[in-house]
Amino acid sequence: MKHLKRNMALLSVAALSFILTACSTAPITSHSTGIWDGVIVYNFSRFIIYLSKLFGGNYGWGIIVFTIIIRIIILPLMIYQTRTTMKTAELQPKLKQLQQKYSSRDAESQQKLREEQQKLYAEAGVNPMAGCLPLIIQLPVMYALYAAVSRTQVLKEGTFLWLQLSDKDPYFILPILAALFTFMSTWLSMKSQPAGSQNGMTSAMTFGMPLVILITALNFPAAITLYWVVTNLFQVGQTLIIQNPFKIQKEREEKIQTEKAKRKAIEKAKRRAMKSKRK
């Protein structure tokens, strides 16, 4: 499932890049038609403008608050994704045992492997596909945000700090921050996983995803990059609260030490019992 989620993340960025290069440039107004332009993008635009007015017409703050609201809305899904990820990480030793048991590449062995994996997931209450939902939801949100900013005149002309929201960040500060917070988010998630569940792909993606975000953000409007900065910063805070890796590692180590102590106590009791029988 971890590989699937990472592939979905890369696919999302690639799909967004493709979509944004081919999207319509017609202005978004109250006369826009269709479900996408007339309903989704238009209402995104209106909501961001409304939020901006609460901050004295500052469209950057409008996008920041909009992003936070989106993250709060999908928070239940993110919590579910986090719990699913943690359960899957705990299953890795058993999944590896199954892979070794059905190491043959013939069709029958691979079918049995899939069946055993599905059985294991079902017993643990894990849905491998559920972890992809937040990624799937956020892609159209980013696309709609891009369309709202680039095709609504007041947002297109909006500024925030040194930024023209419809243009790239001239000083590359936002792309660097977006990549940094992406790295922090993936690194914290990796730290919470059992040591045996990590592999070369995990480490590669910890550094690979921030690089993809950096390269993409360098070529995207500041509004989209600002969204990435805020959403990944939110993710860092969410991880520290819900999936704190330092707390999880401590609890995992305490559990290991407790189990070791129990085994030692059992062995000690057995030795005492053997001595008593000899007497």
Swiss-Prot record:
Q: Where is the lipid attached (N-palmitoyl cysteine)?
A: C23
What is the membrane topology noted in the UniProt record heading this document?
Multi-pass membrane protein
User: Which stretches does UniProt call biased (Basic residues)?
Assistant: 269-279
Q: Name one GO cellular component term.
A: plasma membrane
The transmembrane segments are: 35-55, 59-79, 129-149, 170-190, 210-230
HAMAP family to which the protein is assigned, alphabetical = YidC_type2
What is this protein identified as?
Answer: Membrane protein insertase YidC
Main localization of the protein described in the UniProt heading = membrane
User: Which domain of life does the protein's organism represent?
Assistant: Bacteria
* GO MF terms held by the record: membrane insertase activity
